[in-house]
Amino acid sequence: MPIDATRRITAASVRAILLGVADPEIPNVSIVDLGMVEGIALRNGQIAIELLPTFIGCPAQQIIRDAVIEALAPIGLPVTAEFTFRVPWTSDRISPRGRERLASSGFAPPAEPADVRCPYCSSARVAIDSAFGPTQCRSLFYCRDCRQPFEAFKTI
């Protein structure tokens, strides 16, 4: 989407564009809603994005970085996107909309193990199958009511 050159670029307008950058593993949830965008700086005709990885070893960091740069390219300014480790990402950074979208995608949003609910039927009668899911940030659960397996994001 080409950006109107007469429109002033602000951190808010950059953040609005980044709402369209999805997590590669959960296309329904943006990196903004996951709380991964730590900073947006507009200096000397350049845009610098500071990102937080959900886990230090997250294999999707390069994919996310490239997607951020690609999404902001139509603005026509140089863009850098870098991950920082000076502030740790925690699951409480996930926005309410992000939590809703996680649930609608079949993922239980982060909660204490006793508070995990099935994203399909909302039952609290769930059991953890494995603390280790397909990625470091997720665990495997099973719903005793609807009998669906599901993944839950770990509370960090």
Describe these PLM feature segments.
Residues 1-156:
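Domain-level signature for proteins that mediate thiol-based redox and metal-cofactor handling
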